[in-house]
């Protein structure tokens, strides 16, 4: 039997992913206290690779990994050609448009200035709404943009909303809910179907 390679995202959903694999008896080879990036489980024929969240979908799409665990935010932003096969139900938050309290999102015959770390998601959302936008790509502290006049609104991940409130901002419109998902390479899903379904069944049993 061939090894199944699974790409695991570092960061926000990392801890919960490792916990689930360990509960299923599949994570004993994973050591979170080491700088190693590859872990081999010879008994269960699984190789885990530890990568940046934004790279999980790339490893899966290119066939380096058969499966990956990544946030829905990463999947949407990267617009890659993979199968999304299971909602893990943790790492829950949402995408939202936020701005100064009482502000209006839409500008008739004007460009809306949108600051975000997720330009593809923002472009798609406002295109569907028929609103012309100017994207201002930021890598952090997106909430600052409307306050200092850099943008009209922001598109960002919101968990509790406390950071928005602390900075005088509010959610103006929800975009979509997000959570951690299992994604599969298209060819792997065909040729390693049984192995992949076995993993999914274990997750389903754990969640039910």
From Swiss-Prot:
<dbReference type="GO" id="GO:0005737">
    <property type="term" value="C:cytoplasm"/>
</dbReference>
<keyword id="KW-0808">Transferase</keyword>
<keyword id="KW-0368">Histidine biosynthesis</keyword>
<keyword id="KW-0547">Nucleotide-binding</keyword>
<comment type="pathway">
    <text>Amino-acid biosynthesis; L-histidine biosynthesis; L-histidine from 5-phospho-alpha-D-ribose 1-diphosphate: step 1/9.</text>
</comment>
<dbReference type="GO" id="GO:0000105">
    <property type="term" value="P:L-histidine biosynthetic process"/>
</dbReference>
<dbReference type="InterPro" id="IPR001348">
    <property type="entry name" value="ATP_PRibTrfase_HisG"/>
</dbReference>
<dbReference type="GO" id="GO:0005524">
    <property type="term" value="F:ATP binding"/>
</dbReference>
<keyword id="KW-0067">ATP-binding</keyword>
<comment type="function">
    <text>Catalyzes the condensation of ATP and 5-phosphoribose 1-diphosphate to form N'-(5'-phosphoribosyl)-ATP (PR-ATP). Has a crucial role in the pathway because the rate of histidine biosynthesis seems to be controlled primarily by regulation of HisG enzymatic activity.</text>
</comment>
<dbReference type="Pfam" id="PF01634">
    <property type="entry name" value="HisG"/>
</dbReference>
<keyword id="KW-0328">Glycosyltransferase</keyword>
<dbReference type="GO" id="GO:0003879">
    <property type="term" value="F:ATP phosphoribosyltransferase activity"/>
</dbReference>
<dbReference type="InterPro" id="IPR013820">
    <property type="entry name" value="ATP_PRibTrfase_cat"/>
</dbReference>
<dbReference type="InterPro" id="IPR024893">
    <property type="entry name" value="ATP_PRibTrfase_HisG_short"/>
</dbReference>
<comment type="similarity">
    <text>Belongs to the ATP phosphoribosyltransferase family. Short subfamily.</text>
</comment>
<keyword id="KW-0028">Amino-acid biosynthesis</keyword>
<comment type="subunit">
    <text>Heteromultimer composed of HisG and HisZ subunits.</text>
</comment>
<dbReference type="InterPro" id="IPR018198">
    <property type="entry name" value="ATP_PRibTrfase_CS"/>
</dbReference>
<keyword id="KW-0963">Cytoplasm</keyword>
<protein>
    <recommendedName>
        <fullName>ATP phosphoribosyltransferase</fullName>
        <ecNumber>2.4.2.17</ecNumber>
    </recommendedName>
</protein>
């Amino acid at each position: 039997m061939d090894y199944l390679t699974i790409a695991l995202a570092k960061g926000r959903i990392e801890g919960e992913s490792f916990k689930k694999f360990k509960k299923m008896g599949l994570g004993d080879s994973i050591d979170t206290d080491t700088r190693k990036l590859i872990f081999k489980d010879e008994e269960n024929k699984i190789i885990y690779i530890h990568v940046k969240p934004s790279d999980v979908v790339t490893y899966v799409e290119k066939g380096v990994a058969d499966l990956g665990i990544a946030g829905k935010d990463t999947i949407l932003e990267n617009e890659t050609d993979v199968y999304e096969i299971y909602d893990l139900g943790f790492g829950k938050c949402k995408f939202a448009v936020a701005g100064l309290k009482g502000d209006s999102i839409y500008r008739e015959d004007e460009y809306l200035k949108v600051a975000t770390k997720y330009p593809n998601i923002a472009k798609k959302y406002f295109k569907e709404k028929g609103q012309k936008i100017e994207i201002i790509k930021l890598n952090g502290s997106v909430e600052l943009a409307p306050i200092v006049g850099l943008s009209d609104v922001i598109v960002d991940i919101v968990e509790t909303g406390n950071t928005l409130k602390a900075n005088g901002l509010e959610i103006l419109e929800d975009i979509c809910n997000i959570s951690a998902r299992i994604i599969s390479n298209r060819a792997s899903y065909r040729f390693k179907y049984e192995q992949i379904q076995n993993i999914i069944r274990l997750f389903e049993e754990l969640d039910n």
